[in-house]
Amino acid sequence: MTEAIKTDVLIVGAGPCGLFAVFELGLLDIKVHLVDILDKVGGQCAELYPEKPIYDIPGIPMITGHGLTESLMEQIKPFNPTIHLNEMIESVEKIGDPEFRVITNAGTVFECKVLVVAAGGGSFQPKRPPVPGVEAYEGKSVHYAVRKMEEFRGKDIVIVGGGDSALDWTLNLNPICKSMTLVHRRDDFRGAPHSVEQMRQLVASGKLDLKIGQITELQGDNGQLSGATIKLNDNSVAQIKCDAMLPFFGLTMKLGPVANWGLQLENNLIPVDTGTFETNVPGIFAIGDINTYPGKLKLILSGFHEGALMAQKAVKYVYPDKRVVFQYTTSSTNLQKKLGVN
């Protein structure tokens, strides 16, 4: 067997919650490795909405998913975590009290005192629209996420869906595209009321073509769209020109190997103690979207709070004989020295 990498804590998931947990653990002199199945840090922020504005991070009126990821990476620099990308945890074995041996699909072996599951909703993939042949255009002119807004400048865009993502990208991309069509199966939208109002203003001003119906056929060649056929709710048919399509039908979440780790599960989520965010297995914690408890809000800021409380319990496993005194970064010269600001 490959020689094990020994670390205090192994975090599964390098999204915002996992990254901020590095910061909280680092303040307590805890060494951390992270593993993520994606090829980049940032989790859903980086993979699904790197340029989408986020408005509910405390003290930051607006930041993109990419911007938040960069800021978190800058914040954890003093603690020099080791990040393993393109790897998925395949097995977890308890070898101590507590101590775990963790093996990835790449054969990397870890031995850690604490395991933190910060894997969002598990592995996720966009739901494919029920349009024949759509897979031939995926990645070329059919996109399930906007990674660079500039790629859509001057294009004829069709956006499909009626939720927040569809409305948000309708509003954000409308100023830079050549033309835009929004297609939804009914004239009733699930997004924020303010976004719905702004969308209808674009329709009224002639800047957005709203079609109530469903796309039934795509036209194009070699992965490049040229048009789409829409069956409208009045049974008529509309033909539109488009060279890019953005379907927002939500995500299919799969818990993946986490389901085989001996953790208690509730509707594919992990119940936790809200004082420590520890699972039913001592030494294994769950923070972020993957956990559940009464009153749970799936917000980034909630995951930050969970990471802070998790660290206060994790340190007792890492340093069982050490008396830990709670300190504030604003006044502790010790913490400021760790952060390189003193």
Curated annotation (Swiss-Prot):
Annotated source species: Rhodopseudomonas palustris (strain BisB5)
Extract the HAMAP family matched here: FENR2
Presence of keyword Coiled coil: no
Q: What is its EC number?
A: 1.18.1.2
Q: What is this protein called?
A: Ferredoxin--NADP reductase
Keywords of the record, alphabetical order, are: FAD, Flavoprotein, NADP, Oxidoreductase
Concerning SUPFAM superfamilies, the annotation shows: FAD/NAD(P)-binding domain
Q: Does the keyword Manganese apply?
A: no
Which Pfam families does the UniProt entry name for this protein? Answer: Pyr_redox_2
Task: Give me the reactions it catalyses.
Answer: 2 reduced [2Fe-2S]-[ferredoxin] + NADP(+) + H(+) = 2 oxidized [2Fe-2S]-[ferredoxin] + NADPH
